[in-house]
Design a protein with these regions (language model features):
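Non-heme Fe(II) oxygenase metal-center motifs and adjacent flexible, charged/small-residue loops
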Residues: 1-122
Length: 122
């Protein structure tokens, strides 16, 4: 993964209270208008103490940040190009997802959104 994204993730994690975070994996997701991501937990990593750092690029999206049970109503958090979200500690296993992406065009990425989800997988 490009060093610049590792640096952004490391600095954002430190600012959120997760000093020493060193991502070793990056999940890249591309969304087109109408695409969504259902509520889920990121719990397949060996190290669940390390945070998740999400970098949004392209079209705006609405991030859903729920509770520890899928049935808990999630908060809606608007995300724009360049936004970074960090969650870890007790929030690490909260359900989260993305509302269906609205139509639009971004000057750099066109009709799409790209999300980089950096984490410590191993």
């Amino acid at each position: 993964m490009p060093l610049v994204f590792c640096e952004v993730a490391t600095k954002a994690a430190a600012a959120a209270g997760f000093g020493g975070f060193a991502p070793d994996a990056c999940l890249i997701s591309r969304y087109e208008p109408g695409a969504r991501l259902s509520l889920h937990q990121d719990k397949d990593e060996i190290d669940l103490e390390s945070p998740i750092v999400s970098i949004s690029l392209g079209l705006p999206a609405v991030f859903l940040f729920g509770g520890h049970r899928r049935s808990e109503r999630p908060r809606r958090v608007p995300l724009a190009h360049g936004d970074v979200v960090v969650w870890g500690g007790p929030a690490r296993l909260r359900y989260h997802g993305v509302m269906p992406l609205r139509e639009g065009r971004h000057p750099l990425l066109g009709a799409s959104r790209v999300n980089l989800s950096l984490r410590k997988a191993g």
